[in-house]
Regions:
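Pyridoxal 5′-phosphate
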Residues: 1-236
Length: 236
């Protein structure tokens, strides 16, 4: 199994899903993609395995709450039917059983029923549909082009400032997501202090921290294992 992010939620750097999926399938692996960060900005195409094409995706995971209007929506899994070969649901519960007696039971043959126990998030799912409808109405290509222009302009200015260190490659294709640290003398300003200034003084919404990507943060900041253990001891 190969499971990767379509784009980083830390640096915004985009992965070549076509090349990676092709390589995975050449070696008999499944191609699974996390679109949590990328979904609001880029087209999502599962592709087809017809005519020997190997660039298709076996599954994608999406967090619609990151799209415009998306807070409160459920997560979405889109996967090829052949992956659901287990006749027993991952979480048995209401709606997953088609027939039951005192001696035996049968689970539902339809994947959607078998793998979603209990009452589904009906209103929230309708909302998820609406946010994707909005994205399609604007046009993923339009969004992608406009966001790319924004982030290129920002990086071009920020990378010239001696006290701003934009993390990750400045040349790679990326979403309009940028992580940076601010130097003051021979040290960096605390991230939450920078966030407070951006929000309270300049009205710029931002987030401090490693965004659920601790190991990647170690690499970007050049934190070796010894320094990591020092941080761990202080935190704990």
């Amino acid at each position: 199994i190969g499971s990767f992010s379509a784009a980083s939620n830390v640096t915004g750097i985009i992965t070549d899903t076509v090349a990676v999926s092709t390589l995975l399938h050449q070696h008999g692996a499944l191609s699974l993609w996390d679109y949590a960060a990328a979904a609001p900005y880029v087209p999502i195409d599962m592709g087809s395995s017809a005519d020997g094409n190997l660039a298709y995706k076996d599954a994608v995971f999406i967090s619609p709450h990151k799209l415009i209007g998306g807070p409160g929506t459920p997560g979405v899994l889109v996967a090829r039917r052949e992956l659901f070969s287990n006749r027993v649901p991952d979480v048995p519960g209401g709606g997953t059983v088609r027939y039951v007696s005192t001696a035996e039971h049968d689970y539902h043959p339809e994947i959607e029923h078998r793998e979603e126990a209990g009452t589904p998030a009906i209103i929230e799912s309708i909302r998820a549909g609406l946010v994707f409808q909005l994205k399609e109405a604007v046009g993923p290509e339009v969004i992608e082009a406009r966001e790319s222009a924004f982030v290129r302009a920002a990086i071009a200015r920020w990378q010239q400032h001696p006290h701003i260190n934009v993390l990750g490659s400045h040349e790679a294709d990326r979403l309009s997501i940028v992580s940076f640290v601010i130097r003051h003398g021979d040290r960096y300003l605390h991230h939450n202090y920078v966030v407070a200034l951006l929000n309270d003084v300049f009205g710029i919404q931002s987030r401090g921290g490693c965004s659920c990507a601790g190991p990647y943060g170690h690499r970007l900041l050049g934190i070796d294992i010894e320094r990591s253990h020092e941080f761990q001891r202080v935190i704990n």
